[in-house]
């Protein structure tokens, strides 16, 4: 039996006039398989060539903007012109799949891995209680803003169609937003307005790169995680205020990252409603919205897009497990979409062994290292 998901393959025109061929997006994936210097390895090349064909948008994950922000082994980077050949190769592969390539701009902040850092010292908005990370100085904050901008410039030069500012998860930008990790008493901390100052300054600097280049067609996105656990974690009320500020800027999309697309609000807003509904209402049509979170099959994507809470549906694990995912969705063959890693398909799946713990297998959910 097949299903009709043809509406997922209708084009969508962003607010800058760029038309995306369909409503499916590859979520940014940290691949852990680049070469140690961040250049394209054989494993990364093989993965990129065999995953994401037929998607509308393809966000390549966690592109490093500063050597002091590296959290993962290898990790794609946009630090200098020496990185252009690998950036260009990623662009060429993604375009060959028929997708629009977007580079996600990343800094790990206090979650940078000391083993990968020049001085073995992670830095963030505030020093951590255990002393493992130190507080960024005013000068370092200003420098990081410009490094995000320079990374965007390099990605533009490499041929990327746009960039996504990584303001989701537990990394640098949300570290500034969250009272749990930002205990500053200067203009970068305290009130929500002050805690949003750094992420918005980064976004403004990236937008400035686009405007100075006269590239109306260049896509700018921003990724958020709606809520954090803990007494001082980011609340839905704070997120809705942030969304309002972010989408006042001329961005093309807001990307919402969470465990499950349909999760209801935890606190800080109407808990009878989904986070996605409230966020989409707050965006109020100023940009597109991309939703992610346990979207695996065509039925999942269809339910997300027809909810009215998102313009695009993004997948990560399902893309890793199903090299031909978009083709299967277009054919309405949810019955052929794998939800778990099948060892008999390891070769045809083109999934580097380092990524196996990041996808569920028949014995249970992903076993993250």
Regions found by a protein language model. Name each.
Residues 1-369:
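Flavin-dependent oxidoreductase catalytic cores
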């Amino acid at each position: 039996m097949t299903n009709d998901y043809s509406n997922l393959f209708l084009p969508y025109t962003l607010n800058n006039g760029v038309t995306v061929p369909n409503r499916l997006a590859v979520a940014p994936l940290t691949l852990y398989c680049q070469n140690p210097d961040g250049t394209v390895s054989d494993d990364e090349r093989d993965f990129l060539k065999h995953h994401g064909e037929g998607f509308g948008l393809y966000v390549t994950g966690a592109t490093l903007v500063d050597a002091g922000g590296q959290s993962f082994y290898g990790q794609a980077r946009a630090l200098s012109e020496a990185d252009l050949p690998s950036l260009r190769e990623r662009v060429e592969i993604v375009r060959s799949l028929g997708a629009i390539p977007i580079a996600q701009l990343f800094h790990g902040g206090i979650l940078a891995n000391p083993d990968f850092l020049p001085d073995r010292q992670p830095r963030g908005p505030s020093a951590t209680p255990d002393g493992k990370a130190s507080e960024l100085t005013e000068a370092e904050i200003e420098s990081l803003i410009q490094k995000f901008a320079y990374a965007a410039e390099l990605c533009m030069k490499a041929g990327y169609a746009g960039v996504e500012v990584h303001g989701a998860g537990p990394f640098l930008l949300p570290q500034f937003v969250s009272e749990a990790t930002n205990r500053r008493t200067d203009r970068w901390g305290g009130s929500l307005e002050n805690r949003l100052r750094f992420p918005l300054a980064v976004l403004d600097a990236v937008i400035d790169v686009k405007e100075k280049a006269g590239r109306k067609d260049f896509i700018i996105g921003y990724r958020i995680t709606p809520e954090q656990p803990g007494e001082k974690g980011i609340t839905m009320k704070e997120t809705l205020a942030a969304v309002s500020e972010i989408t006042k800027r001329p961005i093309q999309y807001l990307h919402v990252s969470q465990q499950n697309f349909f999760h209801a609000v935890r606190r800080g807003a109407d808990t009878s409603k989904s986070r996605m509904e409230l966020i989409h209402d707050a965006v109020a049509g100023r940009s597109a919205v991309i939703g992610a979170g346990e979207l695996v099959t065509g039925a999942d994507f269809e339910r997300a897009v027809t909810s009215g809470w998102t313009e695009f549906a993004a997948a990560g694990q399902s893309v890793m497990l199903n090299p031909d995912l978009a083709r299967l969705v277009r054919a309405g063959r949810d019955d052929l979409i794998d939800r778990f890693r099948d060892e008999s398909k390891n070769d045809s799946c083109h999934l580097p062994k380092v990524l196996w713990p990041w996808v569920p297998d028949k014995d249970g959910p992903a076993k993250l290292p």
